[in-house]
């Protein structure tokens, strides 16, 4: 009876977490449509996402402590690990129980990248001429002088000798890159990789002397990179990651016939 009640409690937490994720997705979709329709952005979207994040985080903690109470010996550490990873860290970075938390984070980061990218893609100034990017580079280079420059000398050299002569190419990469990163994070497709490229752009903006939302979005992007195993679970990564696998553990799409035959013999199933 006790185990049945515990299972019902776990199911309830799971469904409530999923409900928060659905609400965050609908709210973010509305925000994106509203912003791309040339309406002024408001703070209600961010405030609502913060509330949803706190609720999802509280539910994730509840699921963690519930799992620990039901299965205290579930987490086993390798004998050669000098500093075993704490159970709570393993839960948030590798357990699907924390996927709703990362889903809310994805909605925030993905929407920021998608709206920023769409604004650039739809602007002629960010086209092949590289007009907007050239102006951005010029403003950044102006910050590279003085005793404590906001833009370091080596990065100013990179902007002047690499980016500026190829402004059209970099304009294309930045505008479409931001759009692709936003879409990838929102739909949860190779989320860790998409977030990694996003963090790379955040760092470049910061090195150019532009603060804006880059520290916050960059920090959230790093969290998505660290939690790559589970942050896209409520998304396409639930299918893509098992199919693609890892360099040291190929997925179903890259398994050899011998491996498939071995798995079939071990499981007793055949096609």
Label every PLM stretch briefly.
Residues 1-177, 187-271:
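Extended, low-polarity transmembrane helix blocks
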Residues 180-184:
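Transmembrane-helix motifs of polytopic, lipid-linked glycan transferases
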